[in-house]
Amino acid sequence: MMELQELYKKTITPALQKEFGFKSVMAVPRLEKITLNMGLGEAVADKKVIERAMDDMIKISGQKPLITYARKSEAGFKIRAGWPIGCKVTLRRDRMYEFLKRLISIAIPRIRDFRGLSPKSFDGRGNYSLGIREQIVFPEIQYDKVDAIRGMDITITTTARTDEEGRALLKAFGFPLKDESR
C-alpha cells in the first residue's frame, strides 16, 4: 500500500526538485486528491440505478460515494432540481495511492484498444482528467454480475502550478501518457 508513497518520497521528489530547480522539497508537486464521478442520466427513469452504481463505486474505491443532485430543472433532459443524477467519491492519502496503483497497473491496461492516455487532458494547472467508458476494467467488478456498463470520470488533482510539472509528476508515477509528437 505504501509503495507509491515511498517511490514519491525517495525517488520522484529529488528527481523533480532537480529537474525544475525547486529550492524546497515542499515546492515539489504532489498528488492532492483523486475524484471519481459517475453521471447517471438513466437514474431519472429508474431510481435503483443509483444504488447499483453506488455499489460499483464502493467496490472500486473502497469508500462510500456521495450522491450528486441536479441543481436546476432541465426540461430537455427530463430532470427536476433536487433529483439524484450521479455519485462521486474523493480519495485522499492512503486510499488515493492504493487506487492510483490499481489504476496504473491493472485498470488502464485492461481498456479496450488502449494506446496511451491523451497528454492534452491537463487543465492548465497540472490537474489531469480522464474518462473510462466501462467500469468492468477494474478487477473488483465481476463481469457476470454487472447489470449495465457505466463509465466514469477520474480527475487527478495535483499541487503542480503548470501542466509540465503535472505531466512530469504523473510520468514519474508510471502514467502511460502518449508522446506529444504524435
Curated annotation (Swiss-Prot):
Entry's Gene Ontology cellular component terms: ribonucleoprotein complex; ribosome
The alphabetized list of GO BP terms reads: translation
Query: Does the keyword field hold Nuclease?
Result: no
Report a single Gene Ontology molecular function. tRNA binding
What InterPro entries does its record include?
Answer: Ribosomal_uL5, Ribosomal_uL5_bac-type, Ribosomal_uL5_C, Ribosomal_uL5_CS, Ribosomal_uL5_dom_sf, Ribosomal_uL5_N
Q: Which UniProt keywords apply?
A: Ribonucleoprotein, Ribosomal protein, RNA-binding, rRNA-binding, tRNA-binding
Q: Which family does it belong to?
A: Belongs to the universal ribosomal protein uL5 family.
Show the PANTHER family listed in the entry: 60S RIBOSOMAL PROTEIN L11-RELATED (PTHR11994)
Subunit structure, per the record? Part of the 50S ribosomal subunit; part of the 5S rRNA/L5/L18/L25 subcomplex. Contacts the 5S rRNA and the P site tRNA. Forms a bridge to the 30S subunit in the 70S ribosome.
What job does the chain carry out? Answer: This is one of the proteins that bind and probably mediate the attachment of the 5S RNA into the large ribosomal subunit, where it forms part of the central protuberance. In the 70S ribosome it contacts protein S13 of the 30S subunit (bridge B1b), connecting the 2 subunits; this bridge is implicated in subunit movement. Contacts the P site tRNA; the 5S rRNA and some of its associated proteins might help stabilize positioning of ribosome-bound tRNAs.
- NCBIfam families reported in the protein's UniProt record: PRK00010.1
Write down what this protein is called: Large ribosomal subunit protein uL5
